[in-house]
Structure formats: C-alpha cells, structure tokens
Amino acid sequence: MKRTLMAFLLLGGLALAQADGAKIYAQCAGCHQQNGQGIPGAFPPLAGHVAEILAKEGGREYLILVLLYGLQGQIEVKGMKYNGVMSSFAQLKDEEIAAVLNHIATAWGDAKKVKGFKPFTAEEVKKLRAKKLTPQQVLAERKKLGLK
C-alpha cells in the first residue's frame, strides 16, 4: 500500500511538472511550433531531435545549457541548416527549466526513444547555472556532442 501511494505521489508530481512545462512551452511554440516541428529553414524542430540529443553522452547538460544561455551560430537538424539565435531563458526558475525540458522530452514521444530516460530536475539546472556561458560557447558544446 505504501509503495503504491509513493508511486502515485511521484507520478502525480511528474504530471504536475509536465503540465507546468506545457504552459511554459507556450513561450517556445512561436518558433518551434506547438507540435515541436519548427519552421523549416527558420527554426529547428524539437520533435525527434531531442531524442537524438538525449542519446548522446552530455546531451542532458547541453539541453539545459541551451535554455540557460541561448545558442548562436549555424546548426543542422534533420539535414536542414539553421543559422540564427535562440535567446536565453535564464530568467526562468530552475524548476521551470526542468519542467519545460521534461515537456519537450516527453510531449512528442522522444523520451520513449531514449533508454532509461530520467526526468530533468531543478538540481541539475542549478548546477549548470553556475557555468556562465555565451551562446557561442553553447554552440561549441553542441559540436562536442558530434551534432552539426
């Protein structure tokens, strides 16, 4: 009984965080679209690409860094090149960044494509907030992952 209650509470908390993440994602949807498909040539898709990032060693950290510090420079996603700027969302609380990352990792099925996916936590975000990177340095982190 206690285990069932504990599982219910934990899953309920994750569902609440995802609901908050969906609300926060509304700030992202103007560029990346509500369905995560992006706008070809202008704003890269998140759906499908988040799983590719999460599968890489260091991918979780990279996603957090993108939200904290932004991203600037040319990238390639699904064979299409994008050369723009993603603004920082450092004004969000650590819990909010974790929530929106959990949303983009689960909303379009990407988490199911990554073996052993674990939800992002505010503690992970807090730890990386101390790094103080530029958007260009975040781009360099992307390249270290082997992503274009």
Curated annotation (Swiss-Prot):
Keywords: Electron transport, Heme, Iron, Metal-binding, Pyrrolidone carboxylic acid, Signal, Transport. Residues 1-17 form the signal peptide. Binds 1 heme c group covalently per subunit. GO terms for molecular function: electron transfer activity; heme binding; metal ion binding. Heme c binds at residues 28, 31-32, 86. This is Cytochrome c-552. InterPro entries: Cyt_c-like_dom, Cyt_c-like_dom_sf, Cytochrome_c-type_DH. This monoheme basic protein appears to function as an electron donor to cytochrome oxidase in T.thermophilus. Pfam families: Cytochrom_C. The modification Pyrrolidone carboxylic acid is found at residue 18.
